[in-house]
Every structure is written in C-alpha cells, then in structure tokens.
C-alpha cells in the first residue's frame, strides 16, 4: 500500500535508486496504490550518468509491496520491500533490466514488457 510521501526502491536499471511518491494517479480522492498502479514520484537518489537524474519527476508502476495482496483463490503474497519500475508516457519501462521478482497482478494491468523482463513472476 503506497501513499503520498512513501519512499520506494527501484527495481530496474534506469539509474534511480530511491523514489519519493508525490501523487497516486487515478482520481482526485485516491489515497493508496497497490501492485500494478501508477504513481508520480521524484527521484531522491540516482547513480551518475544515468537515464534519470536526481530531482526528476517520473511515473512509476508498483511491482512489489510489503502490504499483502489477496488473490482470488484465497492465498496472499507479500514482499520485503516497496519497489517500482520507472515508466515513460507509453507505459513502457525506461530501464532495460528488472531486478527481483514481480507480482502476477501486473499481467492484468497489461504491463507485459515488465513481466517479460522480470527474472521471476510470483
């Protein structure tokens, strides 16, 4: 469960390391974002000579949350961290690699490029 002012880790090689959530997209009164949702973030930490710089405002899709996700079969899945992947306006990842597992719920949101780049889909 991601809300405004949440600090996110980055699960790709776009160059950002830490992100600060500015806004949850999807309506003026929307407070929380889960896996597969898009948030607007600012880059708090970045590596030198990267595609994104510190202070850039980027769109991010959430791929892992520490809050458990309920599945239709009654099972739950949760991760150790809150992580996202930096995307462009065409909903494609800026980076070329994805680190760590991603949730299967991304498939329903049509993030197929992220699913195919991920080493593991849980």
From Swiss-Prot:
Q: Mind listing the GO biological process terms from this record?
A: translation
SMART domains, from UniProt?
Ribosomal_L14 (SM01374)
- Keyword Transferase assigned: no
Q: Name one GO cellular component term.
A: cytosolic large ribosomal subunit
Which controlled-vocabulary keywords does the entry list? Ribonucleoprotein, Ribosomal protein, RNA-binding, rRNA-binding
Q: Which CDD domains match?
A: Ribosomal_uL14
**Gene3D superfamilies reported for this sequence:** Ribosomal protein L14 (2.40.150.20)
Q: Which GO terms describe its molecular function?
A: large ribosomal subunit rRNA binding; structural constituent of ribosome
| Statement: the UniProt record of this protein carries the keyword rRNA-binding | yes
Subunit composition?
A: Part of the 50S ribosomal subunit. Forms a cluster with proteins L3 and L19. In the 70S ribosome, L14 and L19 interact and together make contacts with the 16S rRNA in bridges B5 and B8.
Record's function text = Binds to 23S rRNA. Forms part of two intersubunit bridges in the 70S ribosome.
Q: What is this protein called?
A: Large ribosomal subunit protein uL14
Give the gene name. rplN
């Amino acid at each position: 469960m991601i809300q405004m002012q949440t600090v996110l880790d980055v699960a790709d090689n776009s160059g950002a390391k830490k992100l600060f959530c500015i806004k949850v997209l999807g309506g003026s009164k929307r407070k929380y974002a889960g896996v597969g949702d898009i948030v607007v973030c600012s880059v708090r930490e970045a590596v030198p000579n990267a595609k994104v710089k510190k202070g850039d405002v980027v769109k991010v899709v959430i791929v892992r949350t520490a809050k458990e996700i309920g599945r239709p079969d009654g099972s739950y899945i949760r991760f150790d961290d809150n992580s996202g992947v930096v995307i462009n306006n065409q909903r494609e990842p800026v980076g070329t690699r994805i680190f760590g597992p991603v949730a299967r719920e991304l498939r329903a949101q049509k993030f197929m490029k992220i699913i195919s780049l991920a080493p593991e889909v849980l």
